[in-house]
């Protein structure tokens, strides 16, 4: 809980405003000096200045000094987006002895200079209005307090593939207890189907070593043939019920979702109707059992970059080249054709593409709109493909037709887990992170993280890297004795609450609940301050702190002042 300075409770606002040049990002369009001078005359403003980079350490020190010298009890910074820098400035206020919620940030970069580059005079006037609005709102800001909750230093990892195994081991090595839940009867997931890597990696050996390490680690409890039935609680204190082979109730502080994905099951190219039409995964097993291959045709982007699955599965091209090289090294007389629209051997994998060329693997490019035609020709398979180089059709009769099947989400399992935990899914059924750049392994719900194929298609190395990242983020919570919750959250006026439960239906974070008085109440540990419930409440009984109705009115009326 914050210790508030005496001036936080004073009704008279003493506002300090800092306008940022952001190098030339803002000042090349907006007349920053003119904005700063204009602000000085506004009611409640006792200090105004402009700085080159307000986020620099020198300016942070300057802000702390000005707060103390001029007894500021509100601070407004006009600069870039609060999404990236609000926390920095709030911490500066806290270090200066001012409640961090007595801070307001105005975006005059993304919302002004960047979108009005050809209208500097109008951009300057708009910047004045935006800052004026923030000053009007800041006069009504009130200090907020946080409350502490204890943290259970235990993790639940859902999914026992290589991503889940990696996360569990990482956390266990850091000294945390881990519950590892897997719906299948063995750990390992999709990695069991890879016999070797593009660079010769022994994935079966690697996987066996990791499974043995997990089984021997006393900090990891393994629950096979088990699924999650229910999840309650919030960051630091979750309660999860398991069903299946190890039905029980678990207490833990964080959750890592590593549920994996599946190989696309083709309904095209005679797959399932001809024994010689197989996927790359099946070819890996065939490679161990076969010495002569004859003619092999591989078709890329099967189940990827299509109308149903518009994304690239990232691994298919590399897998095709890996297996093509393996075939040619085992049977140099084999004829291998790879039919492709775009070949994506990203990063160093281009080296293996050149190696395949050297081994006389033939690559045939076909147009996006003209997929190869595959049909039975007696007992054989007939493939007709348009070669864009010669602009004519080529007919091949392979001994093996290998389909580079993509990676698809396990939609039903993901949907059920998403509903249980209020987690977002994208249009393809994959779990979605909170922000692709700022929070790439976090869900919007605090204390819940994701990694591996549950997030999106990626190769094994990327799955391992993301699993380590998720474990690292989880450890930032598990390593604490307590967490502070509250601040910018919604609050409900019980006297006005009609118990209509609209807020319970609207909240995607499961924060509202019905208390023992029959009224709705907000769990501050779950609330993310999105304001959906406040906007939806028909009784107007809900207020979002730091964005109350009176503060909104002050913001808008100040912007519209002449």
What residues fall within each predicted segment?
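Residues forming the flavin
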Residues: 1-5, 9-562
């Amino acid at each position: 809980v914050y210790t508030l300075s005496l001036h936080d409770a004073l009704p008279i606002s003493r506002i300090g405003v800092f306008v940022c040049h952001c190098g030339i990002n803002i000042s090349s369009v907006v007349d920053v000096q003119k904005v700063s001078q204009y602000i000085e005359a506004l009611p409640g403003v006792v200090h105004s200045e402009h700085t080159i980079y307000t986020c620099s350490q020198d300016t942070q020190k300057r802000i702390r000094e000005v707060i103390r010298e001029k007894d500021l009890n509100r601070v407004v910074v006009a600069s870039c987006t609060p999404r990236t820098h609000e926390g920095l400035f709030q911490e500066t206020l806290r270090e200066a002895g001012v409640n961090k919620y007595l801070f307001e940030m105005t975006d005059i970069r993304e919302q002004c200079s960047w979108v009005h580059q050809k209208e500097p005079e109008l951009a300057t006037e708009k910047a004045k209005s935006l800052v004026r609005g923030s000053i009007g709102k800041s006069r009504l800001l009130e200090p907020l307090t946080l409350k502490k909750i204890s943290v259970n230093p235990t993790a639940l990892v859902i999914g026992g593939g290589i991503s889940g195994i990696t996360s569990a081991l990482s956390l266990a090595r850091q000294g945390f207890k881990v519950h590892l839940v897997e719906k299948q009867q063995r750990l390992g997931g999709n990695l069991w189907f890879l016999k070797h890597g593009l660079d010769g990696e022994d994935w079966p050996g690697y996987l066996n070593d990791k499974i043995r390490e997990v089984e021997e680690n006393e900090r990891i409890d393994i629950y096979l043939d088990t699924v999650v039935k229910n999840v309650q609680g919030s960051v630091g204190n979750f309660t999860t019920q398991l069903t299946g082979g190890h039905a029980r109730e678990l207490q833990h502080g964080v959750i890592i979702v590593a549920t994996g994905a599946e190989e696309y099951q083709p309904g095209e190219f005679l797959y399932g109707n001809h024994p010689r039409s197989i996927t790359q995964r099946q070819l890996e097993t065939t490679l161990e059992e076969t010495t002569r291959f004859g003619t092999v045709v591989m078709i890329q982007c099967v189940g990827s970059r299509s109308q149903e699955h518009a994304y690239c599965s990232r691994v298919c091209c590399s897998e095709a080249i890996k297996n093509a090289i393996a075939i040619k090294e085992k049977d140099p007389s084999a004829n291998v054709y790879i039919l492709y629209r775009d070949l994506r051997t990203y990063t160093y994998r281009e080296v293996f593409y050149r190696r395949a060329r050297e081994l006389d693997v033939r690559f045939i490019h076909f147009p996006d709109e003209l997929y190869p035609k595959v049909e039975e020709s007696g007992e054989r398979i007939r493939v007709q493909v348009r070669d864009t180089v010669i602009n004519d059709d080529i007919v091949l009769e392979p001994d093996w037709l290998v389909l580079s099947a993509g990676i698809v989400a396990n939609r039903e399992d993901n949907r059920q887990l998403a509903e249980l935990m209020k987690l977002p899914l994208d249009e393809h059924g994959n779990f979605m992170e909170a922000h692709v750049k700022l929070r790439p392994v976090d869900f919007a719900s605090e204390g819940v993280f994701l990694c591996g194929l549950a997030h999106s298609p990626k190769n094994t190395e990327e799955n391992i890297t993301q699993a380590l990242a998720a474990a690292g983020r989880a450890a930032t919570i598990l390593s604490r004795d307590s967490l502070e919750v509250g601040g910018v959250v919604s609050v409900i006026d019980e006297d006005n609450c009609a118990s209509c439960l609209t807020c319970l239906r609207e909240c995607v974070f499961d924060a509202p609940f019905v208390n023992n008085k029959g009224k709705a109440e907000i769990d501050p540990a779950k609330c993310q301050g999105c304001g959906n419930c406040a906007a939806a409440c028909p009784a107007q009984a809900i207020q979002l702190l730091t964005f109350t109705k009176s503060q909104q009115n002050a913001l808008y009326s100040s912007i519209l002042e002449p």
